[in-house]
Amino acid sequence: MTSITANQKPSKLVPPHGSPELKPLLLNGDALNQALKLASTLPTITLSSRERGDLIMFGIGGFTPLNGFMNQADWQGVVDNMRLQSGDNAGLFWPIPITLSAPKATADSLNAGDKVALVAQDGEIMGILTVEETYTIDKEHECQQVFTTTDPEHPGVQQVLEQSEVNIAGSVEVLSEGEFPTLYPEIYKTPAETREILDNKGWQTVAAFQTRNPMHRSHEYLAKIAIEICDGVLIHSLLGALKPGDIPADVRQEAIKSLIDNYFRQDTVIQAGYPLDMRYAGPREALLHALFRQNYGCSHLIVGRDHAGVGDYYGAFDAQTIFDHVGKDDLITQPLKIGWTFWCNACNAMASDKTCPHDASEHVKVSGTKLRKALSEDEDVPDNFSRPEVLQILRDYYAGIAFDERAEVKLVGASAV
């Protein structure tokens, strides 16, 4: 499978999703300056953190081939059947709705064709939306379909329930990438930039490793399994908002860099980041992770235990089995499904449930939640949990937080095993 990158050189990488080329919606130069002037005269909608991250993904082409926030037909089709229903993209696979909401008073003042400025919570003008339609949704139905729960304690459900009353659909022009290029200059990469790096390495098969945690020994093991199968691995960190108790992106970046520098061959792995918030949608989010990794040029997505999960809402490997229900023509990027991985005391090495013959009493199952809990409570962390260089960076981070200011980390679901 080949695709054409922005500079039109032949590429061995997978093509973008639903399009022969990326479709970034970010303006620059004179077009940007003119749009900013126009935006200053328009009515405004204030974006949630999640909506802001989605808008930036539109801007950089991460959500190719979408051209804006979904209309009612697309919302319904995606929620119920994971398929877009309107326009040129009708029938295209898409697993999670990408929507914008606004208060009813704002929505009532808008007509099809109107333009509205999209503004971040800090006041920065992020984009312009041309209104296609406004519509209301059944929020609980969306939550049940996407998250398989309507429990308001679920952080993704909470995001949906807290949306404003009316959804606003329309195409967007994106005017800013926010703070990401400045805060994370070494790892924040657009899909086009990532593809250029992968092309320059001559890679064809690339496995993405999705992470919102510093990498512990099981993560390292998963990435090295993928390196044996593919030309290389893209360690792709989420840079947007997380839930309380998760470790900030700058600390994760430093910890992952230390791991790569000390324990990986330098020509087999790349660290990069992307601007989304977590939705914690488990299986459905795993599909979204694969879809937009295709836009970044990745042929595979590493899917281990409890991918994109939270608490005990999902089975340990639900995010793997959901791929079995996706047609081969719907999604080019495929999962690398890897089962339980752990440190085995008898093997004196990392192992998996497919390779280790020893009793479970010999196994030390490592999870990011267990690691965060131990560190946040100033407990000893066994050497087989994480590399010493990584642990030192994380200990230094927690040392800077007063004990009574640390978020409680609970072990539930797969993380408690």
Swiss-Prot record:
Transmembrane segments: none annotated. The keyword Oxidoreductase does not apply. CDD domains: ATPS. GO terms for molecular function: ATP binding; sulfate adenylyltransferase (ATP) activity. It catalyses: sulfate + ATP + H(+) = adenosine 5'-phosphosulfate + diphosphate. GO terms for biological process: hydrogen sulfide biosynthetic process; sulfate assimilation. It holds the Pfam family PUA_2. Its EC number is 2.7.7.4. Residues 1-10 have a biased composition (Polar residues). Belongs to the sulfate adenylyltransferase family. NCBIfam families: PRK04149.1, sopT. This is Sulfate adenylyltransferase. The gene is sat.
